[in-house]
UniProtKB/Swiss-Prot annotation:
Induction: Induced by treatment with mitomycin C (MMC) (at protein level). The gene is lhr. Gene3D superfamilies: P-loop containing nucleotide triphosphate hydrolases (3.40.50.300). The lineage of its organism: Bacteria, Bacillati, Actinomycetota, Actinomycetes, Mycobacteriales. It comes from Mycolicibacterium smegmatis (strain ATCC 700084 / mc(2)155) (Mycobacterium smegmatis). Residues 257-451 form the Helicase C-terminal domain. Changing R122A: Decreased RNA:DNA unwinding, wild-type ATPase and strand displacement on a biotinylated substrate. Changing T145A: Nearly complete loss of RNA:DNA unwinding, decreased ATPase and strand displacement on a biotinylated substrate. PROSITE patterns: HELICASE_ATP_BIND_1, HELICASE_CTER. SMART domains: AAA, DEXDc, HELICc. This is Lhr helicase/ probable uracil glycosylase.
Length: 1507
């Protein structure tokens, strides 16, 4: 090796130099500087942006050393590469092949010995046999993860690491500031203890600040060379808004426009990554992008699965390239819930060009090579500047390429976050990174691990621990306290249940493991916390609780019984919280908290918050020209600049000042219930606002006696205060002495939800909550329960190490208390001012803070109409307009409420009518002048004239003329009428009533507005004889004063309307009450009315062959008795049904039928299928006792095509009689193996064996031998209708259970409308409701359906499409308003339109035999209620206690079927188990008999008969 300081490659061997110069033009600056430091043996931190060759910079020197022919053979690993991501580890292993293969080829070209360098990967995905192989034959280069390194160091595998010379830590910035990083730091120190000489450490990092902190993390106390060449990375960033006004949207949502624009961008580029900040948003975006792309391309989206998602989702939502036959699609999803295999497939598809786009969360943020990505799209501001750089850096990943990124804000205030992120990305001004200090739980875990294999000297271990950066300042007292914890020296006997893991001999200072310590460390080790969900169940006193959904652990800790939460489309009130579940009851229409899933997100850092505030303050001070120029520099495109300018202008108009880094705003306003909302507007982020909210909560309790939990977010704090009549607090609520704030927060955090969840994680990390079964995760509920029990004890001992650690984690890692203290200092020093304002409605920034309450509107249409309207009315409409665009109240207000309220205000209701002269006087005083006709409408008597004469004589009411009419006016109004509209004062009016008012016309119009519902300018002008312009000016002035509201309120009025502010509140409150009644679950009777109609029963619109095809599509795959198909099921749905229609569909190949089991000798179960989707609705053929005849028939049909029965005799069994062959064929038909191209054979079987020659079930003789040649003589005699037509093999059922489950979920949603556990059970779906629940939950995430409590008594896990729920609720009243009489329908008991015995249980009040969904049985429903159940032929009838009118309606419907020939005859022999002829007739049976006799049945010796 030659050394040349001027040449970066001069230190490498000739082989390596030749390969590099052949493959690359020149080293990058990062590579050149790194090789200089690494070749000197220095610990080195290489900081460079994505695409600068960092990985090769770290590896090439080590590879060159390994390729040296003179090196001594080693029995262990020499290069250890540690990656925070398993996927990144695999990616690096793949990329290492290039230099290894290249150097080998160069050696071979020169005739030199080829270097033999082995590479291995060990992670959680590595099979045990490969792990054992690596222990036996360690690779030269081992690629692993922090967790796998820990396991190797705590097992015999550590011996393979004793020869390590180089450790490379990739993406070091991703772990340095976390406990996972602290865990890795101790692992590296433990590794050094195994080595003769500490290994050289090389860290690879994206841009970080400060570099010295990451270098300290990497090497601890050892010196480190920092390689950080000037960043040559160029970013092309833009912020785009696709609409001109984000506050006035055509679709009430910005998402449709954003989605269309994203598709434009993706289609204009070769390869794109779309980043979203949540998994649910990623799923929905993927769905919509594919749908839009398909619509543009004219592609029909098929149903298929998304196998990479747990439970899956339709292929057209997020399938890749060719997914189960689906056409090429635009995007697939990539996030933590996607399986590792499918994530790899998505990555490979994008790299290879088979996929145009991936929609991802942070799962693609780190350095995985995604190939030639040329565009990154970020939806809403990224979580941090560093995250933004990482994400956009995915585009133009190669050296020297430009990274192009487009950001789409989700609402107006998100524009500010996007702008500041872009600004700081351009300057590289990222957030400060801080290494955690002294995490005692990590220390405890490693202490058990290090002592597990051999005794350890405590002093030596303490020194090793302190060499790592996270523990550099660890006090000996904390170390000893941790050893006490692990060795069983507890502060109280209450901790006796904690099992000591070590023996600590304080005399010798030796730590020795107790039995099981090593197993505990390897089965429960690691720093990544187990975080999970609480299951939510519907509480029931009588039934087993049914599942509703899931909630985030921290949200549960923040909730209490009585709180109302939102899950799916329904609000639920919490009744109980246990260790593993949350019990709820429906709270229809109540304002609810939306669930959150925080995970590891801790909010905006304080320094980024200061930048946001400074930016906002700066922009607010600029004139428009300077403003535009400033925005242009930040890449604002489209309508982004106008929207941001409008937002800041409106905020300044609302509060007088825009919140900034030096100005906080405390805004107060009343909500819809009259309570106060007090909002602190501050940009400093959740890490500052979270601890401040704790202190504010304490102040509310101590000073005001209010137990209210303020809500903190990145942009401020929201406090809700009940109206007590006093002035609500202002800035004083949020200002604390700088010296007292930390003790207050420290005291309060111990009782917070955050502390409870972090304590559990710390206790588990410290091995205090070991897994009961090695290799398996403990159920989280069990871990929570044990953690809660431990916390109950530990709270009493503040010095308990895990209590200290949980508090430290909350105060240092999650919260930023120092930044909060600094803010309090600034306030005290007047460097930060607080402005108090009181507003009538929320300011734009306040609207954004309250955004969580209306988040559901962002995907409008996801929820049923009543839920959307109720939620909207529960909010301030100005808030809705600010966030979502103009929302007209006419879309929300109930027209019936508007009409009834207007009638009340106008005294047009009976209870408000005038009953005497005094009542008339009150009318005139309250409503103003009225004509005599007006008064007559408002009186209960006819002697109005006498009453008016009396009032006139007493000079209490006077006739006046204006607007072309004569009016009666109260004498008190004469002055107003004179001064307001020029009415002359009648003679004799006392002077006291003619005094002038300050605003006479305003008073007149104000009263007019207060006494009616919405009205127009024209109506006002006509009422008072004014010009329209004059009326408009007065109304506008009153609106400015807040007395009137301008908008569109009533559907029967056109154009601009007005409404008194207080009247509008009444209308909203009453409409909300009405809507909440609608939001309540419908009764089971309503569902039973809905389902037949949903399935077209009784429809007059379903006709002809197309109508029949529609019906079959809905009923696809469901078994129905053949006897009911053409007598009841099809004719009741298709108005003009004829058997020829079905035969035509079968003959054309559009539809096919299959058998699903024989019923006796003359009936069987059949199902119908659309040919295109038949494999998804067919079941696998049933197992029968196959004979040679069966096999030959199947073999013949298996060749393809269709065969007449006569043709089937060829190749069958020699000597087989026609009857025997027919018998075998029908057995295959009923078993679901064979089908025909006509339904005629089934009809023939139904008509009976004597006429059709259909096979009877009998014992078969042993079949004769199989013949290999044609046996043409085996023929049937004549033409047998039971085997007419052509026969073919049914296509194979789709073997993939996931594919079937997804299609089945879609199919059952379409069949049942509201899908419940009972409905799925009745269908006999493989895997039952549990299987479909996973699929339906994924549909919900993708916006394909809603989960809610739509039908009472059917459990909380009900799924439906929003529009279906709207239709269901139209059956709330006694259904059909055009058919007020009883509506009866008789169905086959097996008909899918019969909800009883499926979604609904059978009534239990019958003392006779139990009803069931049996072939031949009938049910009679009257307005959805089950009235009768009749066994086949009607011989036994069960009645369920309906009134006489309902019984008569049922009897009429039943006899109509007999008359129409749908059922052949009717003979009722028993009613409720008692013979009809029994003379002892009770009241109920008498009602039934009367109904039947009245419908035309006659008494016979056997019973009641109708022919």
């Amino acid at each position: 090796m030659t050394t040349n300081g001027a040449d970066p490659l001069g230190r490498f061997s000739a082989l390596t130099r030749e390969w590099f110069t052949t493959a690359f033009a020149a080293p990058t600056p990062a590579q050149a500087d790194a090789w200089s430091a690494i070749s000197e043996g220095n610990n080195t931190l290489v900081i460079a942006p994505t695409g600068s060759g960092k990985t090769l910079a770290a590896f090439l020197w080590a590879i060159d050393r390994l390729a040296d022919p003179a090196r001594e053979p080693s029995q262990g690993t020499q290069v250890l590469y540690v990656s925070p991501l398993k996927a990144l580890a695999v990616d690096v292993e793949r990329n290492l092949r290039t230099p290894l293969t290249g150097i080998t080829r160069v050696a071979e070209r020169h005739g030199l010995p080829a270097p033999s360098i082995t590479v291995g990967v060990r992670s959680g995905d590595t099979p045990p046999n490969q792990r054992r192989a690596m222990i036996a034959n360690p690779p030269d280069v081992l690629i692993t993860t922090p967790e796998s390194l820990f396991l190797m160091l705590t097992s015999a595998a550590r011996e393979t690491l004793t020869s390590v010379r180089t450790v490379i830590v990739d993406e070091v910035h991703a772990v340095a500031a976390t406990k996972r990083g602290a865990h890795l730091a101790l692992s590296l120190e433990r590794l050094d203890q195994l080595l003769d000489t500490p290994a050289q450490r090389i860290g690879l990092s994206a841009t970080v600040r400060p570099p010295e902190e990451v270098a300290r993390f990497l090497s601890g106390q050892a010196p480190t060379t920092i390689v950080c060449p000037p960043a040559a990375k160029t970013f092309d960033l833009s912020v785009q808004v696709p609409v001109p006004d984000m506050a006035n949207l055509d679709n009430n949502s910005i998402w449709p426009d954003v989605e269309e624009r994203i598709v434009d961008l993706v289609e204009a580029h070769n390869s794109s990554i779309v980043f979203a900040n949540s998994r649910r948003l990623a799923e929905r975006l993927t769905s919509r992008l594919n749908e839009i792309h398909a619509e543009r391309s004219g592609i029909e989206l098929p149903a298929g699965p998304n196998p990479e998602v747990g439970g899956g989702a339709p292929a057209h939502l997020m399938g890749s390239g060719q997914a189960n036959g689906a056409p090429p699609l635009l995007a697939r999803a990539h996030h933590g819930s996607v399986s590792k295999e499918q994530r790899a497939q998505v990555e490979d598809d994008l790299k290879s060009g088979r996929l145009r786009a991936v929609v991802a969360t942070s799962s693609l943020e780190l350095g995985i090579d995604m190939g030639a990505v040329d565009l990154v799209i970020q939806v809403e501001a990224p979580p941090s500047v560093a995250s933004g750089l990482q994400r956009v850096g995915r585009a133009g990943h190669q050296v020297g390429e430009i990274s192009q990124g487009v950001l789409f804000p989700k609402h107006r205030t998100d524009l500010i976050g996007c702008a500041v992120t872009v600004q700081r990305m351009q300057t590289g001004d990222i957030e400060t990174l801080r290494v955690p200090a002294n995490p005692l739980d990590v220390l405890a875990q490693h202490t058990v691990a290090v002592a597990a294999l051999e005794p350890v000297d405590a002093d030596a271990w303490f020194d090793a621990v302190r060499r790592s950066a996270p523990f550099a300042t660890l006090p000996r007292s904390a170390f000893e306290a941790t050893l006490d914890l692990l060795s069983g020296k507890y502060p109280s006997t209450e901790f006796a249940e904690l099992r000591p893991r070590l023996v600590y001999d304080r005399d010798t200072g030796t730590l020795t493991a107790r039995p099981g310590a090593q197993r505990l460390a390897v089965t429960s080790g690691g720093a990544i916390p187990d975080r999970g969900m609480f299951t939510v169940y519907l509480a029931s006193e009588t039934e087993k609780p049914s599942r509703v959904g899931e909630l985030d652990e921290e949200m549960v800790y923040e909730s209490r019984p009585g709180d109302v939460i939102s899950l799916g489309a329904t609000s639920w009130r919490i009744t109980e919280i246990t260790h593993d579940r949350v019990l709820v009851i429906p709270a229809p229409g109540q304002p609810a908290r939306l669930p959150f899933w925080r995970g590891d997100s801790v909010g905006r850092p304080a320094e980024l918050g200061a930048a946001v505030g400074a930016f906002t303050g700066e922009l607010a001070s600029l004139d428009r020209k300077a403003f535009d120029k400033r925005c242009q520099k930040m890449g604002f495109a489209g309508y982004a600049t106008d929207n941001l300018h409008q937002l800041l202008r409106e905020q300044r108009e609302a509060t007088g000042v825009v919140p900034s880094d030096t100005t906080f705003v405390v805004e107060r306003f009343r909500d819809e219930l009259g309570d106060w909302r007090v909002i602190l507007h501050s940009p400093y982020g959740l890490r500052v606002h979270g601890p401040l909210a704790l202190a504010v909560g304490r102040r509310l309790r101590e000073r005001y006696g209010i137990d209210e939990k303020p809500t903190a977010s990145d942009d401020g704090i929201i406090v809700r205060l009940p109206d007590s009549g006093d002035t609500p607090p202002g800035a004083d609520l949020f200002v604390f002495d700088a010296d007292e704030i930390e003790p207050i927060v420290t005291a309060e955090v111990g009782g917070s939800a955050l502390f409870a969840s972090r304590f559990r994680e710390c206790a588990a990390r410290a091995l205090l909550l070991p897994r009961r079964h090695p290799g398996k995760r403990s159920p989280l509920w069990h871990q929570r329960q044990r953690a809660a029990q431990l916390l109950d004890i530990a709270r009493k001992y503040p010095d308990f190490p895990i209590v200290l650690e949980a508090v430290r984690e909350c105060l240092q890692d999650v919260y930023d208390v120092p930044a909060l203290i600094e803010l309090m200092h600034k306030i005290a020093q007047r460097r930060l001012r607080i402005v108090e304002v009181e507003t009538a409605t929320p300011s734009p920034f306040a609207a954004s803070l309250l955004f969580g309450y209306v988040g559901a509107f962002m995907y409008e249409g996801d929820s049923p109409l009543a839920e959307r309207r109720a939620a909207a009315l529960a909010l301030d409409t100005v808030l809705l307009s600010e966030l979502l665009g103009r929302v007209e109240l006419r879309e929300l207000l109930d027209p019936a409420v508007v009409a009834s309220t207007s009638a009340q205000l106008q005294h047009l209701t009976p209870e408000r009518a005038a009953r005497d002269a005094e009542g008339v006087a009150d009318l005139l005083r309250l409503l103003g002048p009225l004509t005599e006709a007006d008064i007559a409408q408002r009186c209960t008597a006819d002697n109005i004239g006498a009453w008016l004469d009396g009032l006139h004589a007493a000079k209490r009411a006077l006739p006046v003329t204006y607007a072309g009419q004569t009016w009666w006016a109260a004498v008190e109004d004469i002055g107003l009428l004179r001064d307001g509209i020029g009415v002359p004062v009648p003679v004799g009016v006392p002077a006291a009533f003619t005094e002038s008012a300050s605003d006479p016309l305003g008073d007149l119009i104000g009263r007019y507005a207060r006494t009616r519902g919405p009205f127009t300018t024209e109506q006002t002008a006509a009422r008072f004889g004014l010009g329209v312009r004059v009326a408009s000016d007065v109304l506008s002035r009153m609106a400015v004063d807040g007395r009137l509201i301008r908008g569109e309120f009533a559907a029967d009025l056109s154009g601009e309307q007005w409404c008194d502010a207080q009247v509008l509140k009444i209308l909203r409150r009453r409409s909300l009450a009405a809507l909440r009644a609608q939001v309540e679950p419908v009764s089971t009777d309503a569902y039973a009315r809905f389902l037949p109609s949903w399935q077209h029963v009784g429809s007059t619109n379903t006709t002809g062959i197309d109508g029949l095809a529609t019906v079959i599509e809905q009923l696809a795959g469901v078994p129905i008795p053949a006897s009911a198909v053409e007598s009841l099921v099809f004719p009741q749905r298709v108005r003009d049904y004829q058997p020829a229609m079905l035969d035509e569909l079968l003959a054309s190949g559009e539809v096919m039928w299959s058998g699903a089991g024989q019923i006796g000798n003359g009936d069987g179960w059949v199902a119908f299928h659309l040919a295109d989707t038949a494999p998804l609705t067919l079941t696998h053929g049933a197992e029968i006792e196959f004979t040679d005849t069966h096999r030959v028939i199947l073999e013949t049909l298996g060749h393809g095509g269709a065969y007449f029965f006569r043709q089937l005799t060829d190749g069958t069994v020699e000597g087989t009689a026609g009857q025997e062959l027919k018998q075998a064929l029908w057995e295959l038909i009923w078993a679901g193996w064979v089908t025909g191209d006509t339904f005629a054979p089934v009809r023939a079987v139904l008509s009976g064996p004597r006429r059709s020659g259909a096979p009877a079930h009998r014992q078969r003789q042993r079949p004769p031998r199989l013949s290999r040649y044609s046996v043409a003589h085996a023929q049937t005699r004549g033409t047998d209708p039971t085997v007419s037509g052509r026969w073919s093999a049914l296509p194979a059922a789709e073997p993939d259970s996931t594919v079937r489950a997804h299609f089945q979920a879609e199919l059952l949603l379409g069949r049942h409308g509201v899908l419940t556990k009972g409905a799925v059970g009745a269908e006999g779906v493989p895997g039952g409701f549990a299987t479909l629940y996973k699929v339906l939950s994924t549909f919900e995430d993708a916006g394909r359906c809603q989960r809610g409590y739509f039908v009472e008594s059917l459990g909380g896990a009900q799924f439906a499409v929003a529009s279906t729920v709207d239709r269901l609720r139209s059956y709330l009243d006694n259904v059909d308003p055009e058919r007020p009489e009883y509506h009866a329908v008789v169905l086959a008991a097996t008909d899918p339109a019969n909800p009883y015995g499926a979604a609904l249980g059978w009534p239990t009040d019958s003392e006779a035999h139990r009803p069931g969904r049996k072939a031949g049985a009938l049910v009679a429903l009257v307005d959805g209620r089950l009235v009768w159940f009749l066994e086949r032929g009607g011989r036994s009838l069960l009645s369920f206690g309906a009134d006489a009118d309902a019984q008569r309606a049922a009897a009429g419907a039943l006899t109509d079927l007999v008359s129409a020939g749908r059922i052949p005859s009717l003979l009722v022999e028993r009613i409720n188990g008692v013979a009809v002829l029994d003379p002892d007739v009770d009241a109920e049976r008498a009602v039934v008999q009367d109904a039947l006799l009245g419908a035309g049945l006659s008494r016979t010796p056997r019973g009641l008969r109708l022919r």
